[in-house]
Amino acid sequence: MKVIRIILQVLILYVFFMIGEAIQHLFHLPVSGSIVGLVLLLICLGLRIVPVSIIEDGAGFLLSFLPLLFIPAMTGVINYPSLISFNGLMLLITVVLSTIVTIIAAGFASQLLEKKAKKREEKEKCSKHVSRSL
């Protein structure tokens, strides 16, 4: 039963991909259709049109295979050592800086979400206390 649920959830994600591809081709956008599909999925999740539970297991399944997708890219880089030797320092600087920026952005985002969660908990505690006193 879980296998069928994962397959259906992956199909839902694939539908978002296909819709994104169609929009990209229809409007000749300079952005990949897969990115358009991800933005549509993000909007639908944010507006709660699509609940997370509908895609959670399928997305987790796909994420478990994500490292395998980096192997062909790294093999391609290894096949062209002249690019690495010529632009190696620039690549290293770019990777290090982008990693630092990503870590900082993730830290700020997690702190913001934690503050919102604490405020929500405080409001719930306050409303329970007020309702008990009435």
Swiss-Prot record:
- Give me the Gene Ontology terms describing cellular component: plasma membrane
The places in or outside the cell where this protein is found are: Cell membrane
Q: Could you confirm whether the keyword Transmembrane appears in this record? A: yes
Its domain of life reads Bacteria
Mainly localized where? membrane
In terms of InterPro entries, this protein maps to:
LrgA/CidA
User: What UniProt keywords apply to this chain's record, in alphabetical order?
Assistant: Cell membrane, Membrane, Transmembrane, Transmembrane helix
**Annotated transmembrane regions:** 3-23, 35-55, 58-78, 89-109
What name has this protein been given in UniProt?
A: Putative integral membrane protein YxzK
User: Encoded by which gene?
Assistant: yxzK
